[in-house]
């Protein structure tokens, strides 16, 4: 999976590749879906969500430019898989999930696998998690109309934020914001993606009809 799906498509950070090799992707999937764990595609989990394809997880993690001791915030825990990958590289990970069943399952699985440096919270991810701020890096596993101001405010000067952003729920561009100053952000385009809508006070208020948006989440 790592060489064919990830390294061959341009992800080269050795720490990211090592984390993708180490974390047992199948452990975060329902038993009937485990044979699909290493396919180059999203895989259904629960609550009508999916685990993102391996390449997308690796791409977003690499784009955070992690240094090894980073304080990281993830919005959209999903299965907990991406948080585990982050946990292999960062110093501490806080992940926020709005769907209670997913948050509970992710917390249990991460604890079972020994990821004690990953904290899972059930909340509105568009508001971030101020209690553990500021963050060196923030990654958002859902697409919103814009980057929430609460997330920008919780990013350290010099910090990086990676998120899918789009004017509707059909498709987004993956962007990286780097905070250069109190109100100064550099924006970079990383590619085109499709993700589940980011629902919440600073995101979309409701999803579009089922079937119209690709549903990807960590």
Swiss-Prot record:
It catalyses: [protein]-L-isoaspartate + S-adenosyl-L-methionine = [protein]-L-isoaspartate alpha-methyl ester + S-adenosyl-L-homocysteine. It is found in: Cytoplasm. The active site is at 52. Disulfide bonds: none annotated. Gene3D superfamilies: Vaccinia Virus protein VP39. One of its GO terms (cellular component) is cytoplasm. The keyword Transferase applies. GO terms for biological process: methylation; protein modification process; protein repair. One of its GO terms (molecular function) is protein-L-isoaspartate (D-aspartate) O-methyltransferase activity. PROSITE patterns: PCMT (PS01279). Signal peptide: none annotated. Keywords: Cytoplasm, Methyltransferase, S-adenosyl-L-methionine, Transferase. Its EC number is 2.1.1.77. It is an enzyme of class 2 (transferase). InterPro entries: PCMT (IPR000682), SAM-dependent_MTases_sf (IPR029063). Belongs to the methyltransferase superfamily. L-isoaspartyl/D-aspartyl protein methyltransferase family. Catalyzes the methyl esterification of L-isoaspartyl residues in peptides and proteins that result from spontaneous decomposition of normal L-aspartyl and L-asparaginyl residues. It plays a role in the repair and/or degradation of damaged proteins. This is Protein-L-isoaspartate O-methyltransferase. It comes from Rhodopseudomonas palustris (strain ATCC BAA-98 / CGA009).
């Amino acid at each position: 999976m790592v060489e064919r799906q990830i390294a061959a498509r341009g992800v080269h950070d050795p720490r990211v590749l090592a984390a993708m090799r180490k974390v047992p992707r199948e452990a975060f999937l329902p038993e009937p879906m485990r044979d699909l764990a290493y396919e180059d595609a999203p895989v259904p989990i629960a609550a009508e969500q999916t685990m993102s394809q391996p390449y997308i997880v690796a791409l977003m993690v690499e784009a955070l430019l992690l240094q090894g001791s980073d304080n990281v915030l993830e919005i959209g825990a999903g299965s907990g898989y991406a948080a585990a990958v982050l946990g292999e590289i960062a110093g501490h990970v806080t992940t926020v999930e709005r769907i209670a069943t997913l948050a509970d399952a992710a917390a249990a699985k991460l604890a079972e696998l020994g990821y004690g440096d990953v904290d899972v919270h059930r909340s509105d991810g568009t508001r971030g998690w101020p209690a553990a701020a500021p963050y060196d890096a923030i990654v958002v596993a859902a697409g919103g109309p814009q980057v929430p101001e609460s997330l920008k405010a919780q990013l350290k000067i010099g910090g990086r934020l990676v998120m899918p952003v789009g004017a509707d729920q059909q498709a987004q561009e993956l962007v990286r914001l780097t905070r250069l100053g109190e109100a100064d952000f550099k924006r970079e385009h990383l590619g085109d993606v499709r993700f589940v809508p980011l629902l919440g006070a600073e995101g979309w208020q409701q999803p579009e009809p089922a079937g119209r948006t690709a549903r990807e989440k960590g």
